[in-house]
Each structure stands twice: as C-alpha cells, then as structure tokens.
Amino acid sequence: MASVGVAAGRQAEDTLPPPAEPPLPEMKPLPQPQPPPSVSAQQPQPAPKPPSPAGVKAEENCSFLPLVHSIIKCMDKDSPDIHQDLNTLKAKFQEMRKVVSTMPGIHLSPEQQQQQLQRLREQVRTKNELLQKYKSLCMFEIPKE
C-alpha cells in the first residue's frame, strides 16, 4: 500500500517543471600537480611569521559587546559603576574612530574604491593568465655532465 503512494509522489515530481535556476558556470579542471624539485635545488624557505602582537591586539580591542553587556547588567542592578563603563565605551569608540581613520583607502569615495578593486582584480587575472602560460611552456633540463 505504501509503495503506491511513493510511486504516485514520484510521478508528481516527474511532471513538475525544472527549477528556474541559472546554470552553474563551467569549471576548469585543475592543472596536474608538478613533481617536487630535487632536494639539492630546493632553497631553504623562511619560517612563516606568527601574527604580530599589534594585529592580535587590534582584533581583541574591536569588540564592544562585553562593554555593552556590562552596561546593561549595571543598569539592571542600578549600580554606580555604570558611569565608569559608559566612559570606557566612549573611549573605545574614540579609539576605534582613530583606527578607522588611519586605514588605507579610507579617504577614497566608494566609487573610487570600487574602481581600485576592479583594477586590482584585473591585475590578478592577468598575472594568473601569465602564470598559467609560463607553467604550460615546455621546460628543458640541462644535461648533467
């Protein structure tokens, strides 16, 4: 009895029009991996640098949520510490305004930023094309004596 309902449901699915989704873009196959160069030709790679303390500090200082939470808790308890927390939040806002004003490109209009982004994307695309072109060139090995 259950198989009849399943079959009827499948027939209904078959009669539905296909969804109006755009076709997926055609994906290019990845290039074949190159064998690693010989150990003697390999140059020592510098170790990756750990994130700078200033960068880590900046990420930690950007969160306003703990201060806002503390202010709300003080308001619920009618605590006298609320003025201190509000002043801390105000100082943090001023500090973040200074950080934002020193960011590169902040002086540009949104249109100029979009133009710069398009130029940079075009440069990346061109460089990737050149890289693929150079990778596909026939490489000749120097005979060993």
Curated annotation (Swiss-Prot):
Q: Give the Pro residues compositional bias ranges.
A: 16-38
Task: Report keywords, A-Z.
Answer: Acetylation, Activator, Coiled coil, Nucleus, Phosphoprotein, Transcription, Transcription regulation
Q: Does the keyword Coiled coil apply?
A: yes
Q: Which residues does the record list as N-acetylalanine (modified residue)?
A: 2
Q: Name one GO molecular function term.
A: transcription coregulator activity
Q: Point out residues bearing the modification Phosphoserine.
A: 109
- Coiled-coil positions: 111-138
Task: Cite the residue spans of the region called Disordered.
Answer: 1-58
Q: Is this entry keyworded Phosphoprotein?
A: yes
BP GO terms, sorted = regulation of transcription by RNA polymerase II
Q: Name one GO cellular component term.
A: mediator complex
Q: What is its main location?
A: nucleus
Q: Where in the cell is it found?
A: Nucleus
Family, per entry: Belongs to the Mediator complex subunit 9 family.
> What is the annotated quaternary arrangement, including any partners?
Component of the Mediator complex, which is composed of MED1, MED4, MED6, MED7, MED8, MED9, MED10, MED11, MED12, MED13, MED13L, MED14, MED15, MED16, MED17, MED18, MED19, MED20, MED21, MED22, MED23, MED24, MED25, MED26, MED27, MED29, MED30, MED31, CCNC, CDK8 and CDC2L6/CDK11. The MED12, MED13, CCNC and CDK8 subunits form a distinct module termed the CDK8 module. Mediator containing the CDK8 module is less active than Mediator lacking this module in supporting transcriptional activation.
Function comment: Component of the Mediator complex, a coactivator involved in the regulated transcription of nearly all RNA polymerase II-dependent genes. Mediator functions as a bridge to convey information from gene-specific regulatory proteins to the basal RNA polymerase II transcription machinery. Mediator is recruited to promoters by direct interactions with regulatory proteins and serves as a scaffold for the assembly of a functional preinitiation complex with RNA polymerase II and the general transcription factors.
Its recorded name reads: Mediator of RNA polymerase II transcription subunit 9
Organism expressing this protein natively:
Bos taurus
The gene is MED9
